[in-house]
């Protein structure tokens, strides 16, 4: 847009302000930079058409460059030089760093950053800030606003002798302010300077002609309708806008001015309507406040009624328990008194012994008859001791499972919105957390709010909230070895559903270690089949194995086929997970040092003698006899849908204690600091087996297969993983 066009546009707006249709204060918020929250200073127009100060753009890019360098250094892992997948904190940095740096520069230059106005990523391209237009119109309006704000402060003449006079004009060509006398002296009639453009007193001087940022010597004289930005004729002939539809600057100026003027007139004409709508909104806000408080009071009343019913039932149940307790204690007391009387029968026994001394038969029979009845009764009590009452109160255990379920489903009337349900099968935690939920199609929600918090035994932590438009969300930066609770609620219009049932998930004990299967070191392509992504391997128990079996004689057996991870570990804590296919016959998983792997891989592949004791990492009897807690490897056996705990001299070796159902997903936690390796059930994040391991050497994730079998590495949870799940 030309200089005269911009000034005409500004003059039109200032005319509206002068007429009182628009106050200068009302446009103040349009003159504030969204980054620094101050009046614009040398504003630049971003590709998203928002403006931002020149210094703010530089600060944003420098901040992102610093954060890139910091994150890169923090996440460098000497023990994992071939680590491919970044940590969650790197996702944003990767997203904002794209190709855009000087050819001879070794450090990538950040050219993408989120616009502070719309929060969408804007790409500055290879030219960076130099490719942005300066918003002269906005700059002029800001300067006029500053002048209106400091009307009492005059701009002095730049050429007067001391003391200077107040300026009355500013020359845009000379970039100076003049009083009337100095202006006449320095712009004499009949000279070229007399044709200079002048405006009211200002301190903001701008170039008279807009130059193309891509072709710095060319003037802007056309407007690209596709990119919606001014261009020069070279841009149209062979530049980035060669195949775009362009129009003349005068035509674009006329069209845009008509649209802007029409829209401004419409907005000004609707001022009374807007004020009426604002009043209506104020009434609606007050009504909403009252209705919300009334709804809270009604909810409190309903819950208080439930509390009263519960208190009444509680009192009744406790009274019944107390009555039963008192009755039983009374029976025990009576029985105890009876047995206390038996102790007092010592005198009866003595009396009976004296009666036995009576020699007169008639006198003896007369006395002994009743005495015998008393002795017989005491004897029967001793022979058949039975407590007078039961001590157990099992019949008085309150069953609240049904009521608890009903209370958990407590919701609003059907006029509200149904409660979403979290899909436990599709929700999981690995390097990040993936939470998936579903909602009835007949009651589709506009949006959802996912809430999560870390479960802490010491104190109650507040819930973190994330607004989601879909029915799934990936949550990053969760703490390791922690337990989190997740719940979701739905929104439809102004209606909010209650929260769903909470889902409890456990995070891995250490950061996820990313690797792929190594297709070079020890990989036997005759027996093993590796996919293109190198995250899945299968054992082919087919024709090649039958050919190998021809050479197997009595006392010989086939060896394992090993495959390892392509990245070694020398320090730190690492966790990885995988799935063993249910049809697998025999699979060994764990860790092994590079030296031990070379020893295993040097052994004959097709057949070996049983006299050669191959190190399996567990179950052989010789290993039981010489259990070494500092061995440089640890492997466990999985097969036929069972997980076998290795034998140990310190624990029970009974089969029922060693054979467990095979988990759906198995995790391995290697702690080089403590020199141990743990095997986890990923579904419950529960440790199944722990063993010491020598971490003085480089350790590799190790796998071995025999017969039919398959291993699938757990895929990290990323945005691509979420897209794949949604497609399924």
Curated annotation (Swiss-Prot):
A zinc finger (B box-type) spans 154-192, 207-249. Residues 419-510 form the Fibronectin type-III domain. Disulfide bonds: none annotated. GO terms for molecular function: alpha-tubulin binding; ubiquitin-protein transferase activity; zinc ion binding. Keywords: Coiled coil, Cytoplasm, Cytoplasmic vesicle, Cytoskeleton, Disease variant, Metal-binding, Repeat, Transferase, Ubl conjugation pathway, Zinc, Zinc-finger. It is found in: Cytoplasm; Cytoplasmic vesicle, Secretory vesicle, Acrosome; Cytoplasm, Cytoskeleton. Highly expressed in testis, prostate and brain. Weakly expressed in kidney, lung and heart. Expressed in fetal tissues. Signal peptide: none annotated. Residues 271-345 form a coiled coil. A zinc finger (RING-type) spans 33-84. Zn(2+) binds at residues 212, 215, 235, 241. Residues 508-720 form the B30.2/SPRY domain. The keyword Transferase applies. The keyword Manganese does not apply. Residues 356-413 form the COS domain. Its EC number is 2.3.2.27. PANTHER family: E3 UBIQUITIN-PROTEIN LIGASE TRIM36, E3 UBIQUITIN-PROTEIN LIGASE TRIM36-RELATED. E3 ubiquitin-protein ligase which mediates ubiquitination and subsequent proteasomal degradation of target proteins. Involved in chromosome segregation and cell cycle regulation. May play a role in the acrosome reaction and fertilization. Interacts with CENPH. Belongs to the TRIM/RBCC family. This is E3 ubiquitin-protein ligase TRIM36. The gene is TRIM36.
């Amino acid at each position: 847009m030309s200089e005269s066009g911009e000034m005409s546009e500004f003059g039109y707006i200032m005319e509206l302000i002068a007429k009182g249709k628009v106050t200068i204060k009302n446009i103040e918020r349009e003159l504030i930079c969204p980054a620094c929250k101050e009046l614009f200073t040398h504003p630049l127009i971003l590709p998203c058409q928002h403006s931002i100060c020149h210094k703010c753009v530089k600060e944003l890019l420098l901040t992102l460059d610093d954060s890139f360098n910091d994150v890169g250094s923090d996440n460098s892992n000497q023990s994992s030089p071939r680590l491919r997948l970044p940590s969650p904190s790197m996702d944003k940095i990767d997203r904002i760093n794209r190709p855009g740096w000087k050819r001879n520069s070794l450090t990538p230059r950040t050219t993408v950053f989120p616009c502070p106005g719309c929060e969408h990523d804007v790409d500055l391209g290879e030219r960076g800030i130099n490719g942005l237009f300066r918003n002269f119109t906005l700059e002029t309006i800001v300067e006029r606003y500053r002048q209106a704000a400091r009307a009492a402060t005059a701009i002095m003449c730049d050429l007067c002798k001391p003391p200077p006079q107040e300026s009355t004009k500013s020359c845009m060509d000379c970039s100076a302010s003049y009083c009337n006398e100095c202006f006449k002296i320095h712009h004499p009639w009949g000279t070229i300077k007399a044709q200079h453009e002048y405006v009211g007193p200002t301190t903001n001087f701008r170039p008279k002609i807009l130059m193309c940022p891509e072709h710095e010597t060319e003037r802007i004289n056309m407007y690209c309708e596709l990119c919606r930005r001014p261009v020069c004729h070279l841009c149209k002939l062979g530049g980035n806008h060669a195949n775009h539809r362009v129009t003349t600057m005068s035509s674009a100026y006329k069209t845009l001015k008509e649209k802007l003027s029409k829209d401004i007139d419409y907005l000004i004409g609707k001022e009374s309507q807007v004020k009426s709508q604002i009043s209506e909104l104020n009434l609606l806000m007050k009504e909403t406040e009252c209705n919300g408080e009334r709804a809270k009071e009604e909810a409190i009343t309903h819950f208080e009624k439930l509390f009263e019913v519960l208190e009444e039932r509680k009192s009744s149940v406790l009274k019944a328990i107390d009555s039963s307790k008192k009755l039983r204690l009374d029976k025990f007391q009576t029985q105890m008194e009876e047995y206390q009387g038996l102790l007092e029968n010592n005198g009866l026994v003595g009396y009976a012994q004296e009666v036995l001394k009576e020699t007169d038969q008639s006198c003896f029979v007369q006395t002994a008859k009743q005495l015998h009845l008393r002795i017989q009764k005491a004897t029967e009590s001793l022979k058949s001791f039975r407590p007078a009452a039961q001590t157990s109160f099992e019949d008085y255990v309150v069953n609240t499972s049904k009521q608890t379920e009903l209370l958990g489903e407590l919701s609003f009337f059907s006029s509200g919105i149904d409660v979403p349900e979290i899909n436990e099968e599709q929700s999981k935690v690995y390097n990040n957390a993936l939470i998936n939920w579903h909602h009835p199609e007949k009651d589709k929600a506009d949006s959802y709010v996912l809430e999560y918090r870390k479960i802490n035994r010491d104190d109650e932590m507040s819930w973190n909230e994330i607004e989601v438009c879909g029915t799934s969300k990936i949550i990053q930066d969760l703490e390791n070895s922690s337990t989190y609770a997740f719940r979701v609620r739905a929104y439809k219009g102004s209606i909010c559903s209650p929260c769903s049932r909470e889902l409890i998930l456990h995070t891995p004990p250490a950061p996820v270690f990313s690797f792929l299967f190594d297709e070079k070191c020890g990989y036997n392509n005759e027996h093993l089949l590796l996919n293109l992504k190198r995250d899945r391997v299968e054992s082919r128990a087919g024709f090649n194995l039958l050919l190998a079996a021809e050479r197997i004689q009595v006392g010989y057996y086939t060896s394992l086929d090993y495959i390892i991870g392509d990245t070694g570990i020398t320090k730190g804590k690492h966790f990885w997970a995988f799935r063993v296919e249910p049809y697998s016959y025999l699979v060994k998983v764990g860790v092994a040092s590079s030296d031990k792997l070379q020893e295993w891989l040097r052994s004959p592949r097709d057949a070996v003698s049983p006299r050669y004791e191959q190190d399996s990492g567990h179950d052989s009897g010789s290993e039981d006899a010489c259990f070494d807690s500092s061995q440089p490897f640890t492997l466990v056996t999985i097969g036929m849908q069972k997980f076998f705990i290795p034998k140990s001299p310190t624990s029970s070796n009974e089969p029922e204690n060693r054979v467990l159902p095979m988990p759906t997903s198995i995790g391995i936690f290697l702690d080089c600091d403590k020199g141990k390796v743990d095997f986890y059930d990923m579904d419950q994040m529960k440790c199944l087996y722990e063993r010491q391991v020598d971490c003085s050497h480089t350790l590799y994730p190790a796998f071995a297969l025999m017969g039919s079998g398959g291993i699938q590495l757990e895929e990290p949870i990323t945005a691509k993983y979420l897209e794949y799940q949604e497609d399924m």
